[in-house]
Amino acid sequence: MTLPPCVVHEDDDLLVVNKPPGWNTHAPGPHAGEGIYDWLKHREPKWAQLAIIHRLDKDTSGLLVFGKTTRANRSLTRQFMEREVLKRYILVTDRPAQRDEFTVVSSIVRAGDHYASLPLTAGGERAETRFRVLRRAGERTWLEAEPVTGRTHQIRVHAAAEGLPVLGDALYGGSAAARLHLHAAELEVEQPESGDALRLAVPPDFSTPAARQLRDAVIDRVATDTFRCVQGAADGQPGRYRDRLGGWLLLAGENTPPLTEASALLGSGEGLPAVHGVYFKPLLRQVRKVPVAAASPHLLAGVVAPERFPVRENGVTFELSLTEGYSVGLFLDQRDNRRRLLRGHVAAGFPLYAEAPSGVPEVLNCFAYTCGFSVCAALGGARVTSLDLSRKYLDWGRRNFELNGLNPAGHDFIYGEVFDWLKRLAKKARLYDVLILDPPTFSRSREHGDFRSETDYGSLVSLALPLLRPDGVLLASTNTARLLPEPFIGQVHAAILNAGRRVVQEHYGPQPPDFPVAREEPAYLKTLWLRISGAG
């Protein structure tokens, strides 16, 4: 796989990225959305030792360097502590600068939810920032800021103290703007091995929307043409969602957007070929009770999509349809989990298979839907059994296999109830290297009654565990918003403990970065990857 677009430089010791605005350097909590550091660290085996040396505020964009080796970490830590690292930022303010060059030296102290610049006599940490006016354009002034020290919010605090708050910095008195106009534009460090200077520069982009910059940073448009473009309130558009599906856009919300808005999206490429058509579907709470035709998206503007059309994700081809009901054939928020199956790499220090299998690894995908997980596991070298209570979706899954040069005849597709077949397979003493559980939020059957993820997930795990080989991996996932991370994890762990087995490796995966998380748009997708010891 190619490097993520955010990577600016990589060598044996260093990884340098251009962080987009609105993305944390690291995750703010164990079950929150990943920061750019977490996302990179767990993405590639070669980045497993990635270390944070310095940080950028969530809303600040620009250059960020990570260490890849112990040698690099020691060298970079020394360089930052001895102030040998050159960092230059560019900021924009709408207040007039009276001087072309000036230096601010003060103590920066915490003051509630922000920081304050006080005289050095007040105590606290000494902070120094050099400022230089780059240009004046109308009411806006562009300045270069060079922090000599590295305190939290230092540039923002010092700019505000000089009467030049950063545009978009509401915390420190800046005028309202679409984003914080602060960018880490230049970085110079010493190469840990050679001692040579490494100097990198990335110009600021204060005009492209932050939502677009985030997707530009993580989506390789050559390998992937289907992803979430707008995630509601997390992207500043409460209650509104937009997906790119190859040549089509799918909008979702409470109310149908006006034709003028949909028409304006035609031709907008977002780094891809032009949009052919724009569809809309209302946000439905009870999809099961709505007829297929009524639940299916409807065209707002442009050209009607073919009944079936292909899209790309991480170089894998999937068939989608906008005429088969509420779901289009692929859950975009599971992209990173499909990549883990494709690459055979779960997270830092966590390979999918504990050791090279003596034969072909076996994977059981329950609630397989159109077999997206199955295709990626098969491309990763596994023999896959896909289990679902829909012949239509299993046939769809077979076509997905064929689209990727895989012969469906070399894999099993089982039609039937998952709960029933888990018992049958256990009686046959079948064992699998990987079990995939991604059940619907609610299901109902005559034999097994109602299943609700928020209360019954543990019982599903208990039913599946006898099929998992010792040191096999369980992928347990749910998009049930009402089931919070802690109770979900608790249910899964309790089932494993009750089965007399033990978790030896664990990774919690949130939704991917194109589904960003905010207070107004909380995380909903939860995934546990667990290597489990003990007999099946």
Outline where the language-model segments fall.
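S-adenosyl-L-methionine
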Residues: 390-436
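Mobile active-site "lid"/loop adjacent to the S-adenosyl-L-methionine
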Residues: 393, 415, 432-463
